[in-house]
Amino acid sequence: MWLLSSSPWLSELSCSYSAVVEHTSSVPVPIQWLRFVLLSPCPQRALFSAVDFIFLLCFALHKLFSSPSSSSEINGHAEIRKPLIGIRGRTPTRTTAWFKTTVAVTVLLSFCSVVLCVLAFTGKRRTQRPWNLIDPLFWLIHAVTHLVIAVLVLHQKRFAALNHPLSLRIYWISSFVLTSLFAVTGIFHFLSDAATSLRAEDVASFFSFPLTAFLLIASVRGITGLVTAETNSPTKPSDAVSVEKSDNVSLYASASVFSKTFWLWMNPLLSKGYKSPLTLEQVPTLSPEHKAERLALLFESSWPKPSENSSHPIRTTLLRCFWKEILFTAILAIVRLGVMYVGPVLIQSFVDFTSGKRSSPWQGYYLVLILLVAKFVEVLTTHQFNFDSQKLGMLIRSTLITALYKKGLKLTGSARQNHGVGQIVNYMAVDAQQLSDMMLQLHAIWLMPLQVTVALVLLYGSLGASVITAVIGLTGVFVFILLGTQRNNGYQFSLMGNRDSRMKATNEMLNYMRVIKFQAWENHFNKRILKFRDMEFGWLSKFLYSIAGNIIVLWSTPVLISALTFATALALGVKLDAGTVFTTTTIFKILQEPIRTFPQSMISLSQAMISLGRLDSYMMSKELSEDAVERALGCDGNTAVEVRDGSFSWDDEDNEPALSDINFKVKKGELTAIVGTVGSGKSSLLASVLGEMHRISGQVRVCGSTGYVAQTSWIENGTVQDNILFGLPMVREKYNKVLNVCSLEKDLQMMEFGDKTEIGERGINLSGGQKQRIQLARAVYQECDVYLLDDVFSAVDAHTGSDIFKKCVRGALKGKTVLLVTHQVDFLHNVDCILVMRDGKIVESGKYDELVSSGLDFGELVAAHETSMELVEAGADSAAVATSPRTPTSPHASSPRTSMESPHLSDLNDEHIKSFLGSHIVEDGSKLIKEEERETGQVSLGVYKQYCTEAYGWWGIVLVLFFSLTWQGSLMASDYWLAYETSAKNAISFDASVFILGYVIIALVSIVLVSIRSYYVTHLGLKTAQIFFRQILNSILHAPMSFFDTTPSGRILSRASTDQTNVDILIPFMLGLVVSMYTTLLSIFIVTCQYAWPTAFFVIPLGWLNIWYRNYYLASSRELTRMDSITKAPIIHHFSESIAGVMTIRSFRKQELFRQENVKRVNDNLRMDFHNNGSNEWLGFRLELVGSWVLCISALFMVLLPSNVIRPENVGLSLSYGLSLNSVLFFAIYMSCFVENKMVSVERIKQFTDIPSESEWERKETLPPSNWPFHGNVHLEDLKVRYRPNTPLVLKGITLDIKGGEKVGVVGRTGSGKSTLIQVLFRLVEPSGGKIIIDGIDISTLGLHDLRSRFGIIPQEPVLFEGTVRSNIDPTEQYSDEEIWKSLERCQLKDVVATKPEKLDSLVVDNGENWSVGQRQLLCLGRVMLKRSRLLFLDEATASVDSQTDAVIQKIIREDFASCTIISIAHRIPTVMDGDRVLVIDAGKAKEFDSPARLLERPSLFAALVQEYALRSAGI
């Protein structure tokens, strides 16, 4: 090779023209000049001397111009940390291992330079030419420089310097580059024909190289390693303190450089994991510098200022935060690139050595030693690069999640709707992860051209001009890959968009599963999600088949380009021997890495750019304006809330006001009620006071802190106590008082764990009234100045509402400013002021009597209420008579009792009635949300079997193995053919055409086999992924309601997103790669042991060591991966929960509390990720080191074995395979571990495919007649219900008959079991005993859809799905537009919908948030009116509408459902007064069941309830 020639420039110090240019050489002159400048001793010494001189000059000038005054302290301690300044004062310091190592390295370099200087001056010189003085002078300057640096570093402790000076850092970087050139020159000189022994300067350069590499790292880090008393840390004051105080901080925080270099800090954790499965508590916390709270501050401080007008703020900020880490990984990548080509270059030397062309008997051992050192440096830099890149990715993900969360708490309402909760969750779960993963691929983009250039230069030395064919071939491959990348970019973009849509639909389905089951809409949502999935699957298939095409090109490139290059070389007359051929094939194999990683890097880059764009869009979304409301904690004067000339809109971009001409003033301590019809703007008015709406004009002023109770309850997943305290400390006396005034004491008494009872997701195990009272208690406990209560009485019964109004609103909150939105006219004469709203304007305001006399809007509301109360008051009069003292001659005393008749007054004593009026029961008080189950130990073979055989059984596995083995066999055949044709004994009969023809045929067979294999693996993966998706979707839809009550949606969503993505893409790809790696590893062992057979004796124990390492590592890694998955779900859940309750959080100013909780959850997750990455590189370093030892042992035996035993061509073949042993061995074992960790996703999906299902949806053998129910007769016989085994009964033996067409009202205290009765009639909860017979059919014998689809229901909480008015009122598309309009007209919404431009296609956002709660309830009524069921259930259906609208709805129901059986749960007594019968439920028992009139004639519980409802206003 031309680099190993005996040219004089390689060994002489002459800088003459003759030493540079050899006119007889075939090497071009520019290349000779480049070679001379970089690798010749003369310019090297000149460059190094210049660098030394410049540094010494800078040092001298700095000392010269440092005045004595600079030694004094400036601003306290400002100058104490500046090095090179003579500070006389002493500061207490502590040295770390980093400082000590730096000192040791500088002293060693100084010693080495001094020794070489002495040798240069005392050594014998052959001639007295002038340039012979270059060497001694160079070493003299070099020795002086290193001595100065050693003294400087030692004096840093005296001056308490925390950072190295910039001049020193620049010098160390330059020194590393130049020392690298010295070392390369030394290697080439040793390998050259003229070399007889190693020179002293060559040995010195080999010795100095790792030392300067350490100083390079020191220059990038910048810190000296000294810790002063002021800081206690080289980075942050708080870091060291936190390390000392924490008992279980990651050992990385305090690890020495040596420990970090070889991942020794991971040993204790891996040891624990090997002995027993790791638990969450055993995994150490993150180092302080890696914690989310520190990174969040760094991100905020680096965010571009508005004046910068940055169009890509995320990218800019991340670069500012992590440029040092990016630079350090880039340096590692360059060092790795520098040593990875040493092996291919040495192949020719090994072949020459075994051929007898040796300059020294020791040359073989030197070659083995160089190979060992080069592989060691390659392995170390590779895994340090991987670890630091993954750590950087982890830091970026942590930074982004906390930033996204903080932004979520600031978004305006319209911005929140534009992005949607599902998409925002994807920003955290997908886009942040995408940018994190990108860090491992980042440097491959610019390293690829450099790596290819180096390879081509080396190839040019071996093959000359024929390398042009390789350039053309590689260019063609790159063009194909680039076009494929561009195509994949489009596929990936569409795939992510469709995945977002599927996740959004899945999230919506999970949130409203109760309504879906009530309406028997599972099939509709199944089709809807499958429609999204089919679109996603189409893009997924295109994406994966395109990737498979890229893989085929990548795997085929070495043989294809080799064939073209060898053909060109023979055509040009280049002699091909074993050394040249196998050096070439090895270089092409090395080029596989940039060819493989470049397209993947481009894909990752394109995905990252898409993600950056999405995140930029989100982070630049509008935030709530801080000046929308003028806030003051202490205000002079009497005004607490004031709005002047206010106009407000929900849309930031639209100036069409939702509220206009708003003018009102509330004095301190006043109770102001806000009333109006449905959709008049009452809730919006409260939002405007809170600053939640876009202020178009006007002024809002609020004095003091605010507390908000939303109309739709927002409850956190946690304990009752946590929800009430809401971040404040427990004050028991105050806490108990709050429980009392919010009527929660008896509820808590009935709960198994009292206020420690865990509340399910979205308060699923609480009644509507209990949720409302808990969030009211939360507000009262906060002791705010201004309270905004949005319809807090709608979800509670009359007695509870009266109690809360008296004890809470007029009691505990007396003296506070309260704005109360209410439909309860009864309370209005006890308020200080009333605001009446219509169409977004305040049309009236004043006191009760003033407004009634005006006869306008308020008068209509009061009139409607009084009309509805007439029946109640008449009943109350009867009740008063019934409950008056009676004589034994009273005619009522002898009236016969029905089976359900109430007991007489003698039985219903005062305590009994009081107990009933104040009783509450919780339906289930035990711990509801279960800890997520996780498998421990090895992933079972059953999971692998289920995945691999799901598509085509065992035949799928057999075919993959067959094609993999035959493909690898064809690759081996091509290399055996090269070895045979280039052997010495075949040289005489060598036929170029036969050589090329044979190689091309083998190459084509290899390409065909790898194509079949790749496409088949892709097909298997896609088919399996779709099967798994359909299985889990089907399982979830068939799951009983109890499953959703006890399983947070975050757990299901994590399986539908992260786990499904793993099954879609990662697992099939990686599983195919594992098979390829193991077949490649098998081929390497066969070839290596075939020609260096003694190596087999070492392979067996080293192979056992590999297996032991794998099992030792996997025991911990598997659990860390599982815990990583488990700790991800709480981040998602907490985020979506926070977005849902953001108005409540903001009103109480609790953003910081929730941000800290987010930070805590992020840290919990990232510590798993960090230690998992550490364990991966711990394993990788050791495995690759073992592979390198096997290679070097094999090379040593090739040197030791006589030439008649091992032929040169076999040496080339063996080394070309052996050089990739370390990386293939690592990737084979690492990928198998990676696959096992990712197989946890299959395991997790499998958990949810085995959920116990509810009963069949349809039963053909018991299909009811099409017109069933015929009459609506309902018979309950000893009905008993409990929610889960071993829990108390909720309904305790109810027996009753309801005749067809009867209107039955169900009343009872909050949590008494009313809603449970409806659930059991729909079989959302199966009876624990008894029967339910409807029109002669036992409903337990019917299919669930056959049952539920025949009933109509308006649920307690109105639910709208994202879509349009049409898709919400008729989701199954069974009715015509005419029928829909008629239904909307009957439910009072026709005018509202008709005024919208899109009419029936008007937008409904997630949960119908662009419609008022009352309008949502009316739309739900419209659904039922279309259905026209014979049996109708109303679960507090009019709780959120005013009395006027309630009266209209009741009238509609009476007219449209006159012949239907109606079972209505109601808190408003007027809604049941005109019913046929009333069912009174108390503590799960049917206490009374009779007509309202008969119940009022005697001292019944119902009579007491009616009387209390009628008189509650008077008593307030």
Swiss-Prot record:
List its EC numbers.
Answer: 7.6.2.2
User: Could you list the residue ranges that cross the membrane?
Assistant: 46-66, 103-123, 133-153, 170-190, 203-223, 326-346, 361-381, 439-459, 463-483, 551-571, 953-973, 992-1012, 1067-1087, 1089-1109, 1186-1206, 1211-1231
Q: Which GO terms describe its cellular component?
A: cytosol; Golgi apparatus; plant-type vacuole; plasma membrane; plasmodesma; vacuolar membrane; vacuole
Name the chain's protein. ABC transporter C family member 4
Q: Does the keyword Transport apply?
A: yes
Binding, ATP 2: G1308, R1309, T1310, G1311, S1312, G1313, K1314, S1315
The record lists the catalysed reaction(s) as: ATP + H2O + xenobioticSide 1 = ADP + phosphate + xenobioticSide 2
Q: Which GO BP terms apply? A: response to nematode; response to water deprivation; response to wounding; stomatal movement
Question: In the record, what terms sit under GO molecular function?
Answer: ABC-type xenobiotic transporter activity; ATP binding; ATP hydrolysis activity; ATPase-coupled transmembrane transporter activity
This protein's major location comes to membrane
Q: Where is the ABC transmembrane type-1 domain?
A: 326-607, 957-1237
Induction text: By salicylic acid (SA), menadione and, to a lower extent, by 1-chloro-2,4-dinitrobenzene (CDNB), benoxacor, cloquintocet, fenchlorazol and fluorazol.
Q: Where is this region: Disordered?
A: 879-904
EC main class here is: translocase
Q: What is the tissue localization of expression for this protein? A: Ubiquitous. High expression in the guard cells.
Could you tell me where the Polar residues compositional bias lies? 884-901
- Localization in the cell: Cell membrane; Vacuole membrane
| Membrane topology field | Multi-pass membrane protein
Which domain of life does the protein's organism represent? Eukaryota
Species name: Arabidopsis thaliana
Q: How is its activity regulated?
A: Inhibited by methotrexate.
- SUPFAM superfamilies named in the record: ABC transporter transmembrane region, P-loop containing nucleoside triphosphate hydrolases
After gene disruption, what is the outcome?
Answer: Plants have larger stomatal aperture and increased drought susceptibility, but are not affected by the ABA signal transduction pathway.
Q: Which residues bind ATP 1?
A: G676, T677, V678, G679, S680, G681, K682, S683
Cited InterPro entries = AAA+_ATPase, ABC1_TM_dom, ABC1_TM_sf, ABC_transporter-like_ATP-bd, ABC_transporter-like_CS, ABC_transporter_C-like, ABCC_6TM_D1, ABCC_6TM_D2
Q: Please state the gene responsible for encoding this protein.
A: ABCC4
Cysteine pairings via disulfide bonds: none
Please report the stretch or stretches of sequence annotated as the ABC transporter domain.
Answer: 641-864, 1274-1508
